[in-house]
Every structure is written in structure tokens, then in C-alpha cells.
Amino acid sequence: PKGPYVCYDHFLREGSDEEILGLNNIIFKVIDKLNLLPSDGKGGYRIISNAGADGVQDVPHFHVHILGGRSLGRMVEKIN
């Protein structure tokens, strides 16, 4: 989103319904264009948004990363 949002929860709290729906629609279009939709029989994807110190957020504005095109494996070790 183009607004002054710092992270996902800030975006959900302060963003308009139109902005929130718009971002989700754009994410879907990108995933579809990248040919990653599991509902179309493709391999899938992962959406990441880092937030705060524990989330290792280095850039102080809200954005998402879309990963796909290969097996991504686990990013965080499984806790017993």
C-alpha cells in the first residue's frame, strides 16, 4: 500500500477497507501472473511480511514478499 503504514497490523488498524481489499486483490493478481496458484494445480507460494524487532523488520514501511516457484521448506524450526 502507498499509505504511511509501518507493518501489517498498523495497515489493518489504520487502512481503509478499500486499501485492504485492494492490496489483497493485487497480491492475488501477482500470484496468478507468476503461475503459483495451488487452486489451479500449481506448486504454491508463501507471503511474508516482517514486523517489529522479533520479526526482523529492517525497512520501516509495510510491504509483502511473495515467494514461490520451488519448494520453500520450513523457515522456522519446528518446536517440540
Predicted segments with their positions:
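HIT superfamily nucleotide-processing domains
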Residues: 1-80
